[in-house]
């Protein structure tokens, strides 16, 4: 899949063209062999994957015009002229493999960053640091760098900062802050679909699960780790861009032991893509579990559930049933084992797959139009499919007569009197599809609720390790409401990152009286407003049309075009503008097709159908809609899918904002899912969208470590314990004394009104000093500990001496008597 012209244009707009090359000495002559990057070259014109080439500036060049010869990739050797605004300084004589921190480069302009990442990627070094971020590039192959041995290496080494960057680095630092400062942490893993987010999350979970001691109760940890294959089976699917794409968002809260190992946890799932249950695009699959179940079920299951071949179910795309390199049968065995490890009984597991089979079977039921009740298109179930319908209801533990009535019979109330009519075929199809989607979604959420009931701490979470694994920006040929929600989520996450790393930095420095250069950053506030602002945004106009009599997809787009015409983040599409519109997202323009927007946004299962499900004789089915308020009649404002989505997203962001965040940015190097293939325009767009370039600016300007005086003293009291424990001195002065006594250069730190600010290198030095002090005291502590134990033992013995003497006297008396 080649890079598109639109992507090339988007990437080109990101490049900042300024004339600041340092090729000339004081006399105006060119430094011998001076190298630069340029975006002017026949090579670039012929290969869209390349954006910059390396050249040597030739003698005779002027500041107004540079004469260059291309050397990387090798050119023709013919000199040519370029404008200095198309030239960037180059990092000469730098070995990208000798260090993993982009911030240590002399020049961090765009071509230098791309070149640094490329060299490391081509040598299988996929992790790089851009403080406060870890950049992870998908290798599309197993590098063998996430084994248990690697986990022990990063977990047990005295100074992990000397090791190459890794997701384990992020995990260790987050754990250190969780236990060292006693403050909740969140690791946010983000990136485009197919960038490797799910894999990164799994490896971090494995790191947290590793324990230095074997004294832990592994029951809860086993259940948490077992949930991964189950959640992937029910929540992931093959898309055109990713063979294992997460089609839901997941936030986990974990309690991790000081010795390692997961003690408690909780999972929140949101935004499951329900439309995939009913239909999939070409070359895409529905959720993995359908294929795993149909291929991996044993003969008893197949007979009990009446299973057919994968291509015989209308809910599954018959043209895409296989995934290269994926063994659905083997994966099904793992899912069954994982469900057992989640403490689900054999009967529970049977109910789960009975419901899955029922959903697939209901999808095969055909509805027809019939002349009835004054309607020419009244809905009816095809006679030969009644057996299929009854079987589907039986598998889902639902009363077939009641379900049939809810799908076919329309009940209206006029003047307190119920009037029965018939749904037309289209309406009945919507109800049938809604039932399939609701049963699947609620089953998925029930599995998660069951898991949480086994793994959550009784008293709730005081401090926790948060893990956010969420789909990245999506741009398909046809982008619908699901993609809009996904992309809104990513814009919110982007804003969250900007708020945390840039706006908060500037405000914090100002509030604390710390002087530093002004931080400049890219804000996506305008995009958020055009998408979500109350009363005047895409989602608000969508809700208006859903609630208005006679609302249509076309009227929704027209309303947006009329009311948002002054906003440059929204533009009508050039083709089919009555249903298509374009949003200028952080990653570039994305066109949406509003076909079925209203239908999808109103996709709330009717209250009468919910009541039928809750009356099921099966306790698990009864619990599927547990806690859900049944609403009848007209749809209320705020109950639509879009409103529910925004409320859940707001709650998630509030929870994340209450923690200390860590960021892993996953990069997809190409669209072909091939190892060692590098597409610069695509990568640059991601570097920009994920704020990696801005993070490098922050690195040069700010203080990456900051703690309140109390937190600083808690963390670094052993640097000089006398200074830390001096009760006659205020906490602020205690911090100053510790810093001065440590010998740390004043350029490494600032003292604010309530906080200590340290540059990253300063924090490393303090940690090293404290570690050395603790090593010095280790022998002394051992001696004192032994003395205390001896004293306690002596006290215990002395306490028992009178009793022992009485026993001794009694024994002697007996012996004399004999």
From Swiss-Prot:
It is a peripheral membrane protein. Keywords: Actin-binding, ATP-binding, Cell membrane, Membrane, Motor protein, Myosin, Nucleotide-binding, Phosphoprotein. Residues 661-671 are annotated as: Actin-binding. ATP binds at residues 191-198. Residues 773-818 are annotated as: Tail. It is found in: Cell membrane. GO terms for biological process: actin filament organization. One of its GO terms (cellular component) is myosin complex. Residues 97-771 form the Myosin motor domain. InterPro entries: Kinesin_motor_dom_sf, Myosin_head_motor_dom-like, MYSc_Myo14, P-loop_NTPase. It holds the Pfam family Myosin_head. The modification Phosphoserine is found at residue 19. The keyword Oxidoreductase does not apply. Its main location: membrane. One of its GO terms (molecular function) is actin binding. PANTHER family: MYOSIN, MYOSIN-12. Component of the glideosome complex composed of GAP50, GAP45, MTIP and MyoA; the complex is formed during the late schizont stage and in merozoites. MyoA, MTIP and GAP45 probably form an initial complex in the cytoplasm which is then recruited to the outer face of the inner membrane complex via the interaction with GAP50. Interacts with ACT1. Myosins are actin-based motor molecules with ATPase activity. Unconventional myosins serve in intracellular movements. Their highly divergent tails are presumed to bind to membranous compartments, which would be moved relative to actin filaments. This protein differs from the typical myosin heavy chain structure in having head and tail domains but no discernible neck domain. This is Myosin-A.
């Amino acid at each position: 899949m080649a890079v598109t012209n639109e992507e090339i244009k988007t990437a080109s707009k990101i490049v900042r063209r300024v004339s600041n090359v340092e090729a000339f000495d004081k006399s105006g002559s060119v430094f011998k062999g001076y190298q630069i990057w340029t975006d002017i070259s026949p090579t670039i014109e012929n290969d869209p994957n390349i954006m910059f080439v390396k050249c040597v500036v030739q003698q005779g060049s002027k500041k107004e015009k540079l004469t260059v010869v291309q050397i990387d990739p090798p050119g023709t050797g013919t000199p040519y002229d370029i404008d200095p605004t198309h030239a960037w300084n180059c990092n000469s004589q730098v070995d990208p493999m000798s260090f993993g921190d982009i911030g240590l480069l002399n020049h961090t302009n765009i071509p230098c960053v791309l070149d640094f990442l490329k060299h490391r990627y081509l040598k299988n070094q996929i992790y790089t640091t851009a403080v406060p971020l870890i950049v992870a590039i998908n290798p599309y192959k197993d590098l063998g760098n996430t084994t248990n041995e690697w986990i022990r290496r990063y977990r047990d080494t005295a100074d992990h900062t000397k090791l190459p960057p890794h997701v384990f680095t992020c995990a260790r630092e987050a754990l250190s802050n969780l236990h060292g400062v006693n403050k909740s942490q969140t690791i946010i893993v983000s990136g485009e679909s197919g960038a490797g987010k799910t894999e990164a999350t799994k490896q971090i979970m494995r790191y947290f699960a590793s324990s230095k001691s074997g004294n832990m109760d592994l029951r809860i940890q086993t259940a948490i780790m077992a949930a991964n294959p189950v959640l992937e089976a029910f929540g992931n699917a093959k898309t055109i861009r990713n063979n294992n794409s997460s089609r839901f968002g997941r936030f986990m809260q974990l309690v991790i032991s000081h010795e390692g190992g997961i003690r408690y946890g909780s999972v929140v799932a949101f935004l499951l893509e329900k439309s995939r249950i009913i239909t999939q695009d070409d070359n895409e699959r529905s959720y993995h579990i359908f294929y795993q179940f149909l291929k991996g079920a044993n003969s008893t299951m197949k007979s009990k559930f009446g299973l057919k071949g994968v291509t015989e179910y209308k809910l599954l795309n018959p043209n895409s049933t296989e995934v290269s390199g994926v063994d659905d049968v083997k994966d099904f065995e793992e899912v069954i084992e994982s469900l057992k490890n989640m403490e689900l009984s054999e009967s529970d597991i049977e109910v789960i797959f009975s419901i899955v089979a029922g959903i697939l079977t209901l999808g095969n039921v055909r509805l027809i139009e019939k002349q009835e009740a004054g309607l020419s298109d009244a809905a009816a179930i095809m006679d030969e499919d009644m057996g299929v319908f009854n079987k589907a209801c039986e598998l889902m533990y639902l009363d077939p007569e009641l379900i049939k009535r809810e799908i076919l019979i329309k009940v209206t109330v006029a003047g307190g009197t119920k009037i029965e009519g018939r749904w037309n075929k289209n309406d009945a199809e919507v109800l049938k599809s809604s039932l399939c989607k609701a049963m699947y979604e609620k089953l998925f959420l029930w599995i998660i609720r069951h898991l949480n009931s086994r793994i959550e701490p009784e008293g709730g979470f005081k401090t926790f390790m948060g893990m956010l694994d969420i789909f990245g920006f999506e741009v398909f040929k046809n982008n619908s409401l699901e993609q809009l929600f996904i992309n809104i989520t990513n814009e919110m996450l982007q804003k969250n990152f900007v708020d945390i790393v840039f706006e908060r930095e500037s405000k914090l420095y100002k509030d604390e009286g710390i002087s530093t250069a002004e931080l400049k950053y890219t804000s996506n506030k305008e995009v958020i407003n055009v998408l979500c602002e109350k009363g005047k945004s895409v989602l608000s106009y969508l809700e208006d049309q859903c609630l208005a009599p006679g609302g249509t997809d076309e009227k929704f787009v027209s309303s947006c075009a009329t009311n948002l015409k002054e906003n440059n983040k929204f533009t009508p599409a050039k083709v089919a503008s009555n249903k298509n519109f374009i949003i200028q997202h952080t990653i570039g323009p994305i066109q949406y097709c509003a076909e079925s927007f209203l239908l999808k946004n109103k996709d709330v299962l009717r209250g009468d159908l919910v009541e039928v499900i809750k009356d099921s004789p099966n306790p698990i089915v009864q619990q599927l809609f547990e806690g859900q308020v049944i609403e009848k009649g007209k749809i209320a404002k705020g109950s639509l899918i879009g409103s529910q989505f925004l409320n859940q997203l707001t709650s998630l962001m509030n929870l994340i904002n209450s923690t200390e965040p860590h960021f892993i940015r996953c990069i997809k190097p190409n669209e072909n899912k091939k190892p060692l293939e590098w597409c610069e325009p695509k990568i640059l767009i991601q570097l920009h969208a994920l704020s990696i370039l801005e993070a490098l600016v922050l690195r040069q300007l700010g203080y990456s470590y900051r703690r309140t005086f109390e937190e600083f003293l808690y963390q670094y009291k052993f640097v000089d314990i006398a200074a830390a424990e001096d009760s006659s001195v205020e906490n602020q002065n205690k911090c100053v004394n510790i810093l001065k006594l440590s010998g740390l250069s004043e350029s490494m730190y600032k003292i604010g009104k309530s906080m200590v600010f340290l540059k990253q290198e300063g924090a490393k030095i303090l940690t090293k000093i404290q570690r050395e002090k603790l090593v010095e005291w280790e022998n002394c502590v051992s001696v004192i500990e032994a003395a205390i134990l001896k004293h306690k033992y002596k006290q215990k013995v002395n306490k028992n001496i009178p009793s022992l003497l009485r026993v001794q006297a009694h024994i002697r008396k007996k012996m004399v008597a004999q």
